[in-house]
Design a protein with these regions (language model features):
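Acidic, proline-/serine-/threonine-rich low-complexity intrinsically disordered repeat tracts
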Residues: 7-9, 13-44, 48, 53, ...
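Serine/threonine-rich, low-complexity linker/repeat segments that form flexible spacers/stalks
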Residues: 29, 36, 40-42, 47-116, ...
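A surface/secretory-pathway sequence property marking extracellular, secreted
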Residues: 54-57, 61-88, 129-166, 262-316
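Intrinsic-disorder/low-complexity, polar/charged segments enriched in Ser/Thr/Lys/Arg/Asp/Glu/Gln
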Residues: 103-107, 121, 161, 179, ...
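Short, hydrophobic/aromatic beta-strand segments
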Residues: 117-124, 133-137, 254-260
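Low-complexity, intrinsically disordered segments enriched in Ser/Thr together with acidic residues
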Residues: 164-206, 313-353
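Hydrophilic extracytoplasmic domains
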Residues: 288-397
Length: 400
């Protein structure tokens, strides 16, 4: 059948995940905070002392297609100039809140001129303020399929371009069509702060653009105790993840402080201890709002893991400070239970409030994971046979 599959028929091979964040606080009075959206509540049923405030990071997972990685050495030519863009659009809110799991969706309806052969390819270029993986450790895009038959394999090139290379399905076929729906996630490295951004996708010089404002959450500040965090990387193939926590980003002096990080959903009780690194932030005013931190930058981060009172057990860590008087970043690398329904990591800072004398309080920040799915489908028709040649009519004899 040459019918175009619906998106519900598309395989779940290109799944996208977002990491959600919620805050919990002991306060003198109840704070007004936003309610989580439906997608976030799918990931975490958190009983917070006050209404939850949520953020989300994003993850894309696809089944590995080993042929894709080795596919760039085959023959074929760029057929981007054979593409007609029937429709293109970047669907998005005008304001994107990445920490709430919000993303854009690039949609293309394409047709291809005749003469496309196996091995030929076309490229989609994206502006560097977005990526297709979210917090996934592996970059993948979906195959274009007609039913279960692969029309083209997708791969991510080193420069970030998306390349689709056609299979033998297209040989001797015409009327080739493709429909793509790809999630685009704000890149926390290239967009470190709240800002106006133009998201642009390009095929053969033809641009599709959406202008948005990127707005990050600033974590939780409860009577001077402040925490922020994000799940920054997740690998579903080996069930590992990386979490970053900002401790005391507002840079107050907090006596008798304790930091506690814990996997509260999805902990894998396998006896393996997580890897925990603690960094003192040397330039607190330059911390990224996006909760992206290159901890290898020694001009910004000083590794103090061996200089503090750190205790690490299965699925959690605890840091005790007599006086917390600097900003810290905690990097937490761990396995998780791949069979769990959700993954949630909680960071809590407790101590004496710098606002109120002898007032003990705490602030918690939860990060979870949500999944999105990319879709791609297509079709092509067998060429119609040339009509049987009609014989020339018998010549009529000349009149006598």
């Amino acid at each position: 059948s040459n019918s175009v599959p619906t998106s519900s028929e598309a395989p779940s091979q290109n799944e996208t995940t977002q990491s959600a964040t919620t805050s919990e606080q002991n306060t003198l009075q109840k704070n007004e905070v936003s309610e989580p959206n439906k997608e976030e509540t799918q990931m975490s049923s958190l009983e917070n002392i006050t209404s939850p405030k949520s953020t989300i990071s994003t993850y894309t997972a696809t089944n590995p297609n080993l042929e894709v990685a080795n596919n760039e050495n085959v023959g074929g030519k760029d057929v981007s100039d054979k593409i007609t863009i029937v429709n293109s659009n970047i669907e998005s809110n005008d304001t994107i809140r990445p920490h709430n799991g919000e993303r854009s969706t690039l949609k293309y309806e394409l047709t291809f001129d005749e003469g496309v052969k196996e091995g030929d390819y076309f490229d989609i270029s994206l502006s560097n303020n977005v990526n297709t993986r979210g917090v996934s450790a592996i970059s993948k895009v979906p195959e274009i399929k007609n039913g279960e038959t692969i029309i083209a394999n997708g791969s991510i090139l080193e420069d970030g371009k998306i390349r689709y290379r056609f299979t033998d399905y297209v040989n001797n076929r015409e009327n080739i069509k493709a429909n793509l729906s790809l999630n685009l996630f704000i890149d926390p490295k290239t967009v470190p702060r709240d800002s106006n951004q133009s998201i642009i996708a390009t095929i053969n010089g033809k641009e599709t653009q959406k202008d948005v404002y990127v707005k990050y959450l600033n974590g939780i500040n409860n009577v001077g105790l402040s925490v922020n965090g994000s799940i920054v990387s997740l690998n579903k193939q080996n069930n590992t993840f990386t979490h970053l926590a900002y401790i005391n980003p507002n840079n107050f002096k907090i006596p008798a402080a304790t930091v506690y990080g814990q996997i509260i959903n999805g902990n894998k009780q396998d006896g393996n201890l997580p890897s925990v690194k603690v960094f003192k932030v040397l330039k607190p005013n330059e911390l990224n709002q996006s909760v992206y931190a290159d901890t290898s930058d020694t001009s910004m981060f000083q590794d103090v893991t061996n200089d503090i009172n750190l205790n690490v057990t299965n699925g959690n860590y605890q840091i005790d400070f007599d006086n917390l008087d600097s900003v810290y970043v905690v990097k937490f690398d761990s396995t998780y239970d791949g069979d769990a329904q959700s993954l949630t990591f909680r960071t809590t800072l407790s101590g004496l409030s710098p606002y109120y004398k002898d007032y003990y309080s705490q602030a918690s920040w939860d990060n979870g994971v949500l999944f999105y799915q990319n879709n791609a489908d297509g079709e092509g028709s067998d060429p119609k046979p040339d009509p049987e040649p009609t014989p020339d009519p018998e010549p009529t004899p000349d009149p006598e």
